[in-house]
């Protein structure tokens, strides 16, 4: 028989965080997301990362996206990028993006179909 999913059931399955922990104890997400036309994609991406327990979330994007996301989610760290084609991120921003510290790299939501910055351009140092 399938158990009834109640608030009590859900809370009983969420791991407890140690008292002596801090946001740096729970990973750092770097989201390369959004463009002038797709601001909501970046916002939903950041919100999802924060809600699922990421300690620090940094959004690398263009200014219109950063402004929209920071107004809604002030706990998000920002990595301003130069605008490129179609309101997306310019490849000139790649060095700045790669300097960010992260344990998880998320690329793509809202970059657009003509995005000059893609996974093939970005790797995280090990």
Residue ranges and their predicted role:
Residues 1-122:
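Small-residue (G/A/S/T)-rich helix-start motifs and N-terminal tracts that mark the onset
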């Amino acid at each position: 028989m399938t158990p009834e999913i109640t608030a009590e059931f859900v809370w009983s399955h969420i791991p407890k965080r140690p008292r002596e922990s801090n946001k740096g104890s729970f990973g750092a997400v770097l989201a390369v997301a959004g463009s002038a036309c797709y601001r909501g994609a970046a916002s939903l991406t950041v919100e999802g990362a924060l809600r699922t327990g990421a300690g620090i979330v940094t959004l690398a994007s263009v200014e219109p996206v950063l402004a929209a996301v920071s107004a809604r989610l002030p706990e998000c760290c920002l990595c301003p990028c130069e605008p490129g084609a179609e309101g997306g991120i310019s490849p000139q921003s790649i060095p700045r993006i790669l300097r960010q510290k992260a344990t998880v790299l998320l690329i793509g939501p809202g970059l657009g179909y003509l995005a000059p910055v893609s996974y093939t351009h970005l790797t995280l140092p090990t």
